[in-house]
């Protein structure tokens, strides 16, 4: 048998490959990493380190989101008085001609999605664009504008670095406003009075509170944290109660839990357990946990990387 990178068991996945183990040793904690790990450690590992080599690429939703994000980053990089409809359309053409999006933009469905997203933004929030002042932060000896702003630090007692990119940071009357674009149709919100669940997801609140806490470490005062959904049926801004002590405690708890569980997995010979969940496609596909859709992969390529002898010999 050729050397395999991973071994799949009914309970989880062992990482065998030394290079992958080294990458896992160096993992840092971001909001998306934390959310994915809490859903299923094995699914997180497979998605991050194995799927890129075996997937049948279907990047439509991700690429559409990046296209819109890139447009907004350039648009809000303009001086406030130049943030007009005409200039937004000009920026959109410039971004679309980038190598990242040029071929993707030729698809009619993608074109229509992009037009709808821009139209929704223009109708809902363009009038505010000329009033918004993009914040400037002094980080690591440099002044940096609050667009796709990289922040890092430590939270709670976690040993690993906490980091991420903030889409947009603007000046409020009494501090900073942390904003994040969400380009899906579904509005996701959280009720802090109810238990975290699939129907009451904490991911987006965790993300914005996580960023607010890192900004506070850098000396910032965060006035507001929010999520902007331009592609929802009605464009909506969801405000996150980032100052709620229970919300902040939950963020710290999640950060520390993932940091601790990652240590335990490494000590346990790089073993990562499966968990059942509606989006845990690997757990469902490989060991029959739940009914999540099958991952879009080349099974022959996956079988070359994975020892599947304990789960029936083949996926």
What residue spans do the PLM features occupy?
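Short acidic (Asp/Glu) and glycine-rich catalytic loops that position anionic groups and cofactors
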Residues: 45-51, 182-187, 228-239
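Hydrophobic/aromatic-lined pockets within catalytic cores
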Residues: 50, 72-80, 155, 170, ...
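Nuclease catalytic cores
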Residues: 27-81, 111-115, 148, 284
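A non-catalytic, helix-rich entry segment at domain boundaries
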Residues: 67-149
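Non-catalytic protein-protein interaction segments used by genome-maintenance enzymes to assemble
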Residues: 140-141, 146-207, 218
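Nuclease-adjacent, charged terminal/linker segments that flank catalytic cores
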Residues: 1-18, 23, 27, 36-38, ...
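Metal-dependent nuclease catalytic regions and adjoining charged, substrate-binding loops involved
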Residues: 205, 212-315
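Short amphipathic alpha-helical segments and their helix-coil junctions
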Residues: 19-26, 42-55, 98, 186-194, ...
């Amino acid at each position: 048998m050729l050397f395999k990178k991973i071994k799949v068991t009914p309970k989880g996945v062992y990482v065998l490959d030394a290079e992958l183990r080294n990458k896992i040793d160096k993992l840092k904690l971001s909001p998306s990493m934390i959310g994915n790990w809490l859903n299923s450690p094995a699914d997180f590992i497979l998605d991050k380190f194995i799927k890129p080599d075996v997937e049948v690429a279907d990047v439509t939703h991700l690429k559409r989101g990046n296209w819109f994000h890139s447009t907004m980053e350039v648009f809000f990089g303009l001086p406030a008085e130049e943030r007009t409809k005409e200039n937004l359309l000009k920026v959109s053409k410039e971004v679309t001609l980038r190598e990242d999006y040029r071929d993707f933009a030729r698809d009619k469905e993608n074109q229509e999605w992009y037009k709808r997203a821009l139209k929704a933004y223009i109708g809902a929030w363009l009038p505010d664009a000329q009033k918004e002042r993009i914040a400037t932060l002094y980080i690591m000896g440099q002044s940096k504008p609050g667009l796709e702003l990289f922040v890092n630090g430590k939270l709670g007692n976690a040993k690993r670095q906490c980091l991420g990119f903030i889409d947009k940071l603007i000046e409020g009357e009494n501090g900073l406003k942390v904003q994040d674009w969400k380009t899906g149709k579904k509005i996701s919100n959280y009720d802090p009075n109810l238990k975290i669940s699939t129907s009451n997801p904490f991911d987006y609140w965790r993300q914005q509170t996580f960023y607010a806490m890192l900004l506070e470490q850098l000396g910032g005062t965060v006035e507001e944290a929010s999520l902007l959904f331009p592609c929802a049926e009605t464009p909506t801004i969801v405000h996150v109660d980032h100052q709620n002590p229970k919300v902040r405690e939950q963020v710290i708890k999640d950060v520390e839990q993932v940091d601790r569980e990652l240590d335990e997995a490494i000590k346990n010979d790089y073993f990562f357990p499966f968990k059942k969940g509606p989006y845990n496609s690997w757990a469902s596909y490989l060991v029959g946990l739940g009914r999540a859709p099958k991952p879009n992969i080349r099974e022959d390529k996956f079988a070359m990387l994975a020892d599947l002898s304990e789960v029936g010999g083949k996926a």
